[in-house]
Amino acid sequence: MTLRNDWTREEIQALYEQPFLDLVFKAQQVHREHFTANTIQVSTLLSIKTGKCPEDCKYCSQSAHYDSKLEAEKRIAVEKVISEAKAAKDSGSSRFCMGAAWRNPHERDMPYVLEMVREVKALGMETCMTLGMLNQSQAERLKDAGLDYYNHNLDTSREYYSHIISTRTFDDRLNTLDYVRQAGMKVCSGGIVGLGESREDRIGLLHELATLPIHPESVPINMLVPIEGTPLADVEKLDVIEWIRTIAVARIIMPHSYIRLSAGRESLSDSDQALAFMAGANSLFSGDKLLTTPNAGEGKDQALFNKLGLTAEKPKPTVSDLSVDAMSA
């Protein structure tokens, strides 16, 4: 399928409105054109600083604006992060993602995160961070330290965004993605479904992502995990079929991107997840927790992979890895 960055909302809506089986069939066809069938990229996500975030994202347990009963934690030691990364690699993860509950990293935090990137990279894993908004200098220093991916989700459509967050703008998020691109890193950016948004908002989110100058290399599609004490604690749960439709449409309009199953997966059956893989999802977060929300554990994931005949993708060699191999030849 031809790579496009000029999708219209009308075209994306037409995909959403296809009969479900036709949509999933098309998505699987597109997936097999661009990726190895039955292979899933596995990532692990670790919270390196938890809670007391100054942002007011209405879905988030880490926001200081809400009483979610979350116990805040200070930055964890780099040595602890490396230990967790080694365990993740041993369990089959090819990418290690590190997240901090910050609006943006302060300059005093930069030596800490840069050391972390270098140490995890030295393990032979792909590296990813989500630290909030970045400026251009911070993005460039992260790239120089060896960071492969930077995650900064758009969360929802531009139109619905102000219903969810007021402490940073939609364009603030786009600016950070631009800084990441200019620095030469890969982009991880997606959103959350089930926030009380309409299908038109889900279309709007995917339209924003698919019309970026370069599609995000990874697109996480989160299902809201309602957190007691947050404004969205009692929001009506989105139908799983609608979530899978969103995955399928994302696969079709961003054919080269990894489509990742993220938050909300622990509540899904094996059959639901199998349908999501059929719809073109080819990445997931493994481990018992995603930052502060529960997640399917590694044992459950391996059992699911065995049941479905899936294998975990191996880490891709970096330019530096290839250079070392060439020198050794």
From Swiss-Prot:
Binds 1 [4Fe-4S] cluster. The cluster is coordinated with 3 cysteines and an exchangeable S-adenosyl-L-methionine. Binds 1 [2Fe-2S] cluster. The cluster is coordinated with 3 cysteines and 1 arginine. Its cofactor is [4Fe-4S] cluster; [2Fe-2S] cluster. [2Fe-2S] cluster binds at residues 97, 128, 188, 260. PROSITE patterns: RADICAL_SAM. One of its GO terms (biological process) is biotin biosynthetic process. Signal peptide: none annotated. It comes from Acinetobacter baumannii (strain ATCC 17978 / DSM 105126 / CIP 53.77 / LMG 1025 / NCDC KC755 / 5377). HAMAP family: BioB. [4Fe-4S] cluster binds at residues 53, 57, 60. This is Biotin synthase. It catalyses: (4R,5S)-dethiobiotin + (sulfur carrier)-SH + 2 reduced [2Fe-2S]-[ferredoxin] + 2 S-adenosyl-L-methionine = (sulfur carrier)-H + biotin + 2 5'-deoxyadenosine + 2 L-methionine + 2 oxidized [2Fe-2S]-[ferredoxin]. Homodimer. Its EC number is 2.8.1.6. It comes from the Bacteria. Catalyzes the conversion of dethiobiotin (DTB) to biotin by the insertion of a sulfur atom into dethiobiotin via a radical-based mechanism. InterPro entries: Aldolase_TIM, BATS_dom, Biotin_synth/BioAB, Biotin_synthase, Elp3/MiaA/NifB-like_rSAM, rSAM. Pathway: Cofactor biosynthesis; biotin biosynthesis; biotin from 7,8-diaminononanoate: step 2/2. SMART domains: BATS (SM00876), Elp3 (SM00729). Keywords: 2Fe-2S, 4Fe-4S, Biotin biosynthesis, Iron, Iron-sulfur, Metal-binding, S-adenosyl-L-methionine, Transferase. Belongs to the radical SAM superfamily. Biotin synthase family. Residues 38-262 form the Radical SAM core domain. GO terms for molecular function: 2 iron, 2 sulfur cluster binding; 4 iron, 4 sulfur cluster binding; biotin synthase activity; iron ion binding. The lineage of its organism: Bacteria, Pseudomonadati, Pseudomonadota, Gammaproteobacteria, Moraxellales.
